Amino acid sequence: MSPEATTRSGVVFRVLDAMDAPHSGRILRLRLQSGEAPSIKSLKGSTLKAVSPDGDECRGKVLGFAAFGGKPSNERLARTGRIDVHVEELDDTGPVGLRWEVHPS
């Protein structure tokens, strides 16, 4: 199965922490909630759909990864289920916050 297909097949992350990035965008600390961990390569540059507990939706683009939790790798994501992503919000419905569900698309 290709990394792109894996990313779209029921993968759901939960936002554990969200903060403004130093220059632009947001840093989201994500935990894999369900599905198989996607590859780092498939996440970079992908579009994410975030859904709040109230049902509000926000889209964002993954610009890169925050390294303060350690260098991101496929093995680390598969083992821990956690990743820190730097996202640019693509619409004005955000900001994405705690307990939001994030779906890669």
Protein language model features and the residues they cover:
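C-terminal effector/interaction modules appended to NTPase cores
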Residues: 2-105
